[in-house]
């Protein structure tokens, strides 16, 4: 189109079909209308099927993940119960061991005390026995020392007779 022509004649419509490319546009629009829906429809259908498949896969993974989460929660609660049971058992066991240790310590202390008392009493009885022995020896020595001065012949004769009678009786 000529610009000088437009400037001189003013605004107008051009109805010449060959100049305006209306036929070309009509062919293109008709082709798009006729062939584009089947071609574009197939592409959109494939894309839609792909999206639906991905959504179904995502939903399946969500279901599996939910099941796995539920199982993990159940396992966790079971493990927590088992841990608390083990903790309670270990507390009971440690308390039992502590009580047993205290009992053994008390028994050992009593045994040591009894041993000390028996050692002390055996020491005391040995000392008493030793003192008695020394007292008897001292008394015998004193008696023997004083005996010659006290014994006269009649007393000595009576003593010998009495000793003989004692021997005969036994």
Curated annotation (Swiss-Prot):
| Assigned keywords, A-Z | ATP synthesis, CF(0), Hydrogen ion transport, Ion transport, Membrane, Thylakoid, Transmembrane, Transmembrane helix, Transport
InterPro entries this protein is in?
A: ATP_synth_B-like_membr_sf (IPR028987), ATP_synth_b/b'su_bac/chlpt (IPR002146)
Source species: Prochlorococcus marinus (strain MIT 9312)
| Coiled-coil spans in chain | none
Q: How does it sit in the membrane?
A: Single-pass membrane protein
**What is known about what this protein does?**
F(1)F(0) ATP synthase produces ATP from ADP in the presence of a proton or sodium gradient. F-type ATPases consist of two structural domains, F(1) containing the extramembraneous catalytic core and F(0) containing the membrane proton channel, linked together by a central stalk and a peripheral stalk. During catalysis, ATP synthesis in the catalytic domain of F(1) is coupled via a rotary mechanism of the central stalk subunits to proton translocation. Component of the F(0) channel, it forms part of the peripheral stalk, linking F(1) to F(0).
Q: Name one GO cellular component term.
A: proton-transporting ATP synthase complex
Transmembrane annotation, as ranges:
15-37
> Oligomeric state and partners?
F-type ATPases have 2 components, F(1) - the catalytic core - and F(0) - the membrane proton channel. F(1) has five subunits: alpha(3), beta(3), gamma(1), delta(1), epsilon(1). F(0) has four main subunits: a(1), b(1), b'(1) and c(10-14). The alpha and beta chains form an alternating ring which encloses part of the gamma chain. F(1) is attached to F(0) by a central stalk formed by the gamma and epsilon chains, while a peripheral stalk is formed by the delta, b and b' chains.
Tagged with keyword Transmembrane: yes
- Which family, according to the similarity comment? Belongs to the ATPase B chain family.
Superkingdom is Bacteria
Where does the protein end up?
Cellular thylakoid membrane
* Protein name as catalogued: ATP synthase subunit b
Q: What Pfam families does the record tag this protein with? A: ATP-synt_B
Q: Which GO terms describe its molecular function?
A: proton-transporting ATP synthase activity, rotational mechanism
């Amino acid at each position: 189109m000529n610009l000088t022509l437009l400037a001189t004649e003013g605004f107008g419509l051009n109805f010449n079909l060959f100049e305006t490319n209306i036929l070309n546009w009509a062919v293109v629009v008709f082709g798009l209308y006729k062939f584009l829906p089947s071609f574009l429809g197939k592409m959109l259908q494939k894309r839609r099927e792909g999206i639906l498949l991905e959504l179904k896969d995502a939903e399946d993974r969500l279901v599996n993940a939910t099941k796995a989460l539920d199982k993990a929660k159940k396992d966790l609660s079971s493990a927590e119960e088992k841990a608390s049971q083990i903790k309670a058992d270990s507390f009971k066991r440690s308390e039992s061991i502590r009580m047993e240790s205290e009992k053994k310590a008390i028994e050992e202390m009593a045994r040591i005390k009894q041993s000390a008392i028996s050692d002390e009493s055996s020491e005391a009885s040995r000392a008493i026995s030793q003192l008695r022995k020394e007292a008897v020896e001292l008394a015998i020595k004193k008696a023997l020392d004083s005996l010659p001065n006290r014994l006269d012949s009649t007393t000595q004769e009576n003593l010998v007779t009495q000793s003989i009678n004692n021997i005969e009786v036994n």
